[in-house]
Amino acid sequence: MGASENVQVMLEIFRSIERRDAQRFLDLCHSDVEFHWPPSLPYGGASRGRPGTSPTWSDTWLPLQPGETERRMDPRVVAAGDDEVVVLWRQRGINPDGDRFDGPVLGLYQVLEGKLARAQMFYFDTAALVSFLAKTRGTAET
């Protein structure tokens, strides 16, 4: 597949995440897809394949994204090649106290045979994100 087709795959993946269409998301991923998140995040580190017992992005963010505003990722393709796509997107959330997080993320995605094979995310301000999530966990515990 070429760059144009890979871009379409990635944009469809972002649409499936925004719509909370887990089946469509899984259909667009290789069965042994790799995800790489900053290690300081609750869902940080590397994982391969379908979700296991470790915390996932979905475990963390679905409760913090009750509406379309928080779910909107505004993906913008920055670069694309024969097997990689770079996308700038927004991570948004709101906690029970009404505190909001809205930060940019740069994702490097490998697309093979029309499916996502590897994703690595780079947050611009991981410290602010960790602080927001820690405060959110504190709110949930009280």
What are the language-model segments listed below?
Residues D21, E34, F124-D125:
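Poly-acidic low-complexity segments
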Residues M10-I13, F25, V33, G49, ...:
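Hydrophobic pocket/interface hotspot
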